Regions:
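Anionic-ligand binding patches
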Residues: 1-4, 11-191
Length: 191
């Protein structure tokens, strides 16, 4: 099945394309402007992106939204993970702000989770929705050179002490929130 990617994030698009490799994945149209993610839920933001791309291309569109929920911060940054340090913040700025907010949180109280909502919207209005979750903790400092976003400070419980940024991509995808959501979505699509 042909699916058009709604994400403009190259790292995220690559992860998704690897997981949905049984489908004909097309990149997001370059002439499509920014899609403002102004919903209060991950599902709402994923839907905004998928609907916009589906309407623009006439093909089913696949989108996701992910939030990092840190218990010591009351669930923040959550739906605002990509904009935690401001609307045009970089990954490094978001990561620095999170570590700064947590500087006084002891190692045993740094529990967190990544939550992903993955969604396909079809031209006829149908939707397929899937969820992925991974529990872990926030490290005291960045570690590892792979991944993107908060990967260098998130150590999944199933990661044998490594951060996502220290893992090989296949190992990360096998336990990650995004991997779980998109594998579930792939099953619903008939893979």
């Amino acid at each position: 099945m042909r699916l058009v990617m709604a994400s403009a994030n190259a790292h995220k698009a690559q992860e998704i394309a690897e997981i949905l490799s049984g489908h004909d994945i097309k990149p997001r149209p370059h002439d499509l402007g920014d899609i403002v993610e102004n919903e209060n839920t991950l599902e709402g933001n994923a839907r905004l992106k998928a609907v916009a791309v589906c309407n623009e291309t006439g093909f089913p569109a696949v989108a996701d939204d992910t939030g990092l929920e840190v218990d010591a911060l009351g669930g923040l940054p959550g739906v605002r993970s990509a904009r935690f340090a401001g609307e045009s913040a970089t990954d490094d700025e978001n990561l620095s702000k999170l570590l700064d907010e947590m500087r006084k949180v002891p190692e045993g109280e740094r529990t967190a989770r990544f939550r992903t909502v993955a969604l396909v919207v079809f031209p006829d209005g149908r939707e397929i929705l899937a969820h992925g979750l991974v529990e872990g903790s926030i490290t005291l400092s960045p570690s590892g050179g792979g991944g993107f976003g908060y990967d260098s400070i998130f150590a999944p419980d199933e990661g044998k002490g490594l951060t996502f940024a220290e893992m090989e991509p296949e190992a990360k995808n096998s336990i990650s929130h995004r991997g779980r959501a998109f594998r579930s979505l792939a099953k619903m699509l008939g893979d």
